Amino acid sequence: MIIDCHNHVGADLMFYLHGDFPYAQHLVAMTREGRALGVSKWVVFPFVVPIVFKIEALKRGEIIFDGTGLEKVPYAFENRRLMKEIYEFFPDEGKDCLPFAMLDPMREQAAQIKELRKLRGEYKFYGLKLQTTMIQSFIKTLGNEGRGFVELAAEWDIPFLIHSSVGEQDPWAQASDILDVAEKFPHVRFCLAHSCRYDKECLDRVNALPNTWFDCSAHCIHCDGAVADMPYIAERKRRFDSDYTNPARVIADLAAAYPTKFMWGSDSPFYSYVGMLGEKRLALISTYAKEVAALKANKPEVVDRIANRNIRAWLKLKDESLLADQ
């Protein structure tokens, strides 16, 4: 069995209006493409920027939270829309998906928690997802003003999956800050996305902490970034040592170095990304097929460990039948 632990379903108004890519993914299209490649199950969550922000600003690529957005509570609309798609609109495809709810740790915390409790009473979801870079929300707040979300995760015994960065241009989602939060709450499980941008110090901290994992979402374009020494990748002096011209080799090396903490995820459809990095437009292009091929180039034991067993340990499902072959 191959579980893909990192996928977005829905639409992103800022990406569409600002001319960035990708801006949407349909649940049925994701499962059909993935299943043809050998993927069996998917962890899924909404797209990144909720419709609570000023629409005119989104078109300029700006985040302004002034009460004029289409909704008032971050991700309330997006989370409910995802649950309806999985459980009501497309239950045949939805039965192979484990939905996570998204949240903003910095804005309207009490209102979000109220909405999450209400949603939990109507639908099952299995974790909480944060992407704080695009919404310019400091991940540090999760351990302070936003600790109510951590208390929810502890109460429901569900994990976090958190977008991580290491570049100076991104103060909102620093991997070291996420690890500080995880260290503060040792009884809650955390996954840091994107292999901590190959920052060895952060990967070693993930390995040392009992409650942290990392995923390799958008692996191929991150390998490309390492080869080109792009600023969204850890500097060479801090970088995990591997042959980044060979994404399959990097997976093998990470799996050997961090045998129980490394999880595979594609980041569909964000295995490709076109957008701005500072003053430059990035065009990073990969495919779902390339992500799966880099995984499958490894030994069957490695594939089963990072795309099945480690993910199950992080999810810690009360009902393992959810991951049974249908």
Short names for language-model regions:
Residues H6, G34, L82, L128, ...:
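Conserved, mostly hydrophobic/aromatic
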Residues I3-N7, W42-V44, L98-A101, Y126-L130, ...:
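Hydrophobic faces of well-ordered beta-strands that scaffold small-molecule active sites
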Residues R60-Q169, A173, I221, R236-R239:
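Active-site gating/metal-coordination segments in enzymes
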Residues E122-G127, G148, E155-P159, K184-R189, ...:
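Glycine-enriched alpha-helix->loop->beta-strand junction motifs that scaffold or abut catalytic
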Residues G10-D12, V49-V52, M106-E108, M134-Q136, ...:
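Active-site environment of divalent metal-dependent phosphoester hydrolases
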Residues M1-F77:
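An N-terminally biased module of ancient metal coordination in phosphate/nucleic-acid-related enzymes
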Residues E33-S40, L82-L98, L152-D157, F185-H187, ...:
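A structural motif corresponding to the C-terminal end of an alpha-helix
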Residues C196-Q326:
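H/E-rich (His + Asp/Glu) clusters that bind or coordinate divalent metals
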